[in-house]
From Swiss-Prot:
Segments of this protein annotated with the region Disordered: 1-34
Entry keyword annotation includes GTP-binding: no
Compositional bias ranges of the Basic and acidic residues kind: 16-33
Gene name for this UniProt entry: Ac132
Domain notes: Contains a domain homologous to an NEBU domain that is known to bind actin.
Taxonomy, superkingdom: Viruses
Region (NEBU-like domain): 103-134
Function recorded in the entry: Plays an essential role in nucleocapsid entry in host nucleus. May act by binding and stabilizing F-actin in the infected cell, which might attach to nucleocapsids and then push the nucleocapsids into the nucleus.
Quaternary structure note: Interacts with viral envelope protein E18 and the DNA-binding protein p6.9.
Species whose genome carries this gene: Autographa californica nuclear polyhedrosis virus
UniProt keyword 4Fe-4S present: no
Cellular component, GO, one term: host cell cytoplasm
Keywords: Host cytoplasm, Host nucleus, Late protein, Virion
Protein name: Protein Ac132
Subcellular location: Host cytoplasm; Host nucleus; Virion
Length: 219
């Protein structure tokens, strides 16, 4: 027979906490702990007095800073939605522009009197969504638009992509004017029907871009 008197599990430890006048912080303090690093607070709980001070989270400077930041985020999100309503609308187009010399361009006129424009440094992972599309290697003509000088062409006849050399070649009707500027627009979302945004075209119309290099007559 044991001479130990049964005691309530954890009773001795609980009595010690009560003697110290310490109680567990309310559940709100758990949220406070989760966000403590995010708000760059250096306050730490070094003594039992510090723990006791969290009994009323509303009186904690860290908790008040957390509430302030959360309210500021809500205000910022509402302001962004007001200024940029596009953030709440479905995204139908995502347009990338290739311009010379960032993407080096060169051209020639072949014997069929067609303009061949070559654009280098274009990665396959930008043109294609997956490895299957890369293997097929057929750029979708409707995803591209070509601007020569300040005019966006109505017609692109063919598009080819050299995987090894990362060169995109566009065939289009030859132009009567001297070619001073060329921009290739690519809609990443591959929409069949889309237009180049006016603000984007205006931007490139006003920019002084380097003209594409003229190559010898090709076949």
């Amino acid at each position: 027979m044991s001479d130990k008197t049964p005691t309530k599990k954890g009773g001795s430890h609980a009595m010690t906490l009560r003697e110290r006048g310490v109680t567990k912080p309310p559940k709100k303090s758990e949220k406070l702990q989760q966000y403590k690093k995010a708000i760059a607070a250096e306050q730490t709980l070094r003594t039992t007095a510090d723990v006791s001070s969290l009994q009323n989270p509303g009186e904690s400077a860290v908790f008040q800073e957390l509430e302030r930041l959360e309210n500021a985020v809500v205000v910022l999100e509402n302001e962004q939605k007001r200024l940029y309503p596009i953030l709440d609308t479905p995204l139908d187009n995502f347009i990338v522009a290739f311009v010379n010399p960032t993407y080096p361009m060169a051209y020639f006129v072949n014997t069929d009197y067609k303009l061949k424009l070559e654009c280098a440094r274009i990665r396959s992972d930008l043109l294609y969504k997956n490895k299957n599309e890369v293997a097929i290697n057929r750029p979708k003509i409707s995803s591209f638009k070509l601007q020569l000088n300040n005019v966006i062409l109505d017609t692109i006849e063919t598009i080819e992509y050299d995987l090894q050399n990362k060169v995109l070649t566009i065939t289009a009707p030859v132009q009567d004017q001297e070619l001073r500027k060329s921009i290739i627009y690519f809609n990443i979302l591959n929409s069949d029907s889309w237009e180049v945004p006016k603000y984007m075209k205006k931007l490139f119309d006003e920019m002084q871009l380097e003209p594409p290099v003229i190559l010898p007559l090709g076949l």
